[in-house]
Amino acid sequence: MFMNPLLPPLWPMIATAVETETEIAPLVLAGVLLSLVVIYFASKLGGEVCLRLNLPPVLGELVGGVLVGVSALKLLLFPEGGLAPEDSLVIQLLMGSADLSPEAAQSVFSAQSEVISVISELGVIILLFEIGLESNLKELIRVGPQAAIVAVVGVVTPFSLGTIGLMTIFGVAAIPAIFAGAALTATSIGITAKVLAEINRLSSNEGQIIIGAAVLDDILGIIVLAVVGSLVKTGEIQISNIIYLILSATGFVVGSILIGRLLSPFYVSLVNRMKTRGQLLLVSICVAFVLSYIAQIVQLEAILGSFAAGLILAETEKREDLEEQILPLADFFVPVFFVCVGAKTDVSVLNPAVPANREGLIIAAFLILVAIVGKVVTGFTLFGKSELNKLAIGVGMIPRGEVGLVFAGVGAASGALDPATDAAIIVMVIVTTFVAPPWLRAVFEGAKKEEAPEKPVPTPD
């Protein structure tokens, strides 16, 4: 075989690359396994503490992520932000046990971070699929106009105030401001529903309006996220582009639901005919992944597809079985997303002792104010409904919870948010999640005392 003497022989180079890759692969796996141990330990510890404090476990998962991430223990780190392998305690452990060179350590750090990031993205896809399953379109239609008014006002008001305020008052660039404004839109169904159930108000008129509006809020919020995410990809803000994205996102959800209803009998028939274990879960996950793929290739967010899949399958007779079967899968993947969001959040950028950080704190305070006011006003838009506890409806729409974290996670991953704005959104989510439950209880209990008839004062004989 003819070989050019001026060119270096390729085989030794290829062999060296293969050997290096072969040596690194087990270490990448070891790094992923150690990272998952850290993630699950942090999520369970934080979740258990919050549950005992009568707070949503998801908040504990977020705080657990903050503790093990870049802000504190540095057990779970990612290359974003210029972090080096030596900064990660997990990589330090691997370097000490395997005598890694700096180049090999960088390769392991990058590869294991990519794997964890992919698992995190799968977690948010499954989370939105689960939220879609829990959304009852028929119930939403029943509460109808009142829930729609609350939802639309609850999306438009905080989004407009947040975006315009960040751009005009703080001079934030358009796309980060739009992303932060979008993070103010969605309401956490789970947190509000839990509080309403605890105080026996879930079936009340106010409770039904809140839940119906929260469901519609989620749909509108995910559409807003898809539109904003697409704006980040294109890098352009044009009215025609925004209108196209809104129409395409709305059309995708509506079209998916309509087509899904036509194909639902085939889905049920297929699942019933299959005899192997896990047929319902795997077929359903395939539906979610296919719609996520379609959403992704048409320049929308993958989570919009999984959410639409959940809405579709929630209308079938398999809903209850699927809700039960999806739980173990969600328990495995979803905590990875929340802990990673917390781990990537550098709360040191909000340290008031550093003068340069004070603007970030002011932005956080501004977002918290808009997040609360923008939702409280929603109840008072129901004109002519004096019998309703309008303040309770508004307060019930305050908590952002997991949906707000989805916005923060997607925004940070896409590079649309700088560390200070990302941390400000995280603080907003934490504060609204803390504030809403006790306030909602107090509002309903106060109304109950006012409704109680006064006892007659006994007259002396």
From Swiss-Prot:
GO biological process: proton transmembrane transport; sodium ion transport
A GO CC term assigned to this protein in UniProt: plasma membrane-derived thylakoid membrane
Membrane topology, from the record: Multi-pass membrane protein
Originating species: Synechocystis sp. (strain ATCC 27184 / PCC 6803 / Kazusa)
Induction line: Induced in response to increased CO(2) concentrations. Expression is under circadian control.
Annotated keywords: Antiport, Ion transport, Membrane, Sodium, Sodium transport, Thylakoid, Transmembrane, Transmembrane helix, Transport
The protein's name in its UniProt record: High-affinity Na(+)/H(+) antiporter NhaS3
Family assignment from sequence similarity: Belongs to the monovalent cation:proton antiporter 2 (CPA2) transporter (TC 2.A.37) family.
Lineage, top ranks: Bacteria, Bacillati, Cyanobacteriota, Cyanophyceae, Synechococcales
Result after altering E402 to A/Q: Lack of activity
Entry function: Na(+)/H(+) antiporter that transports sodium from the cytoplasm into the thylakoid lumen in exchange for protons. Contributes to sodium homeostasis and tolerance. Also has Li(+)/H(+) antiport activity under K(+)-free conditions, but not under K(+)-rich conditions.
Subcellular location: Cellular thylakoid membrane
pH sensitivity of activity: Activity is pH-independent.
Origin superkingdom: Bacteria
Gene Ontology MF annotations: antiporter activity
Transmembrane portions of the chain: 22-42, 58-78, 113-133, 148-170, 175-197, 209-229, 239-259, 280-300, 360-380, 391-411, 424-444
